C-alpha cells in the first residue's frame, strides 16, 4: 500500500464545499475521489487538511490517499487532470511514508480573504473576490485585525452549526493590507472553526463602515455568543492558500495563487 500527498487547486463556485455530501450534491472531495478511483482501478478515499464551505476556493489544499496502484507521480497528475473538471487541478503529488497525515500532521493553516472595494462590481472576478461598494476606513480595519492575534476563545466567531469540541484557537497572525482597490486579509492559525475567517472578515467590514469601534471586539470575545458579532462575510473572496507541516515531510510550496491573490504585504 502506497501513500501519496497531493496539492489541489480549485474554484469552489460549483461545489457545496470540500467534504463529500449526500448523493447528487457536488463536492470537491467526491469529484477527485471518483477520478482517482478510476485511475487506480480501486476505491480511493481522500483525507484533506481542512474543510472549505460552499463557494470557498483553494490554491493549495493538501490531501492524502492510500492505494495499491503503482503509478509514477507524473502519471497520477496527468491522468487526473485530463479527467477532472476545469475548475479542479492537481498541482503536485508526492509519495509519502505512512506517518504522514494531511489533517493530523498539519501544524498550521493559512487563508486569504480578498475584498474588491470600488463603486462598481468586477465582472471578470465574479465570485472570486467579495465586492464592497461602500467607502471603508481601511486604517481602522488594519488596526482592528491585530485584535484577533494570539490565543482566544472564538465561540463568538464560529458558526452555530460548528461541530468542533472546543473553540480555543491560536492565531499566529491576522493582517489586513491594501493594494489599490484590493483589501487582503491574511490569517494563519493552528486550526480554524466553521465560518471563523468569514465571521472575522464580517466584523472588520462593519468596523470599516463605522458601525462600531475597535474595542468592541473585546466585548464580542467576552460574550462567547455568535449573536454578539455581526455578519458572516460571503464565501466568494475566501481562499485556503497554505498548510504547514514539519520539515521532515518536505512538501512542495507553490505560489499563493494568481497575482491579485499573491499580493505582497
From Swiss-Prot:
Please name the Pfam families in this protein's record. PseudoU_synth_1 (PF01416)
The record's annotation in InterPro entries points to: PsdUridine_synth_cat_dom_sf (IPR020103), PsdUridine_synth_TruA (IPR001406), PsdUridine_synth_TruA_a/b_dom (IPR020097), PsdUridine_synth_TruA_C (IPR020095), TruA/RsuA/RluB/E/F_N (IPR020094)
SUPFAM superfamilies in the cross-refs = Pseudouridine synthase
**Which Gene Ontology terms cover its molecular function?**
RNA binding; tRNA pseudouridine(38-40) synthase activity
Against CDD domains, the record matches this protein to:
PseudoU_synth_EcTruA
Enzyme Commission number(s)? 5.4.99.12
HAMAP family linked to this entry? TruA
Q: What is this protein called?
A: tRNA pseudouridine synthase A
Out of the domains of life, which is the source?
Bacteria
| Family statement drawn from the similarity comment of this UniProt entry | Belongs to the tRNA pseudouridine synthase TruA family.
Any single GO BP term: tRNA pseudouridine synthesis
Q: What class of enzyme is it?
A: isomerase
Active-site residue list: 53
What job does this protein perform?
A: Formation of pseudouridine at positions 38, 39 and 40 in the anticodon stem and loop of transfer RNAs.
Q: Where is substrate bound in this sequence? A: 111
Subunit structure, briefly?
Answer: Homodimer.
Catalytic activity, reaction form: uridine(38/39/40) in tRNA = pseudouridine(38/39/40) in tRNA
- Which keywords belong to this entry? Isomerase, tRNA processing
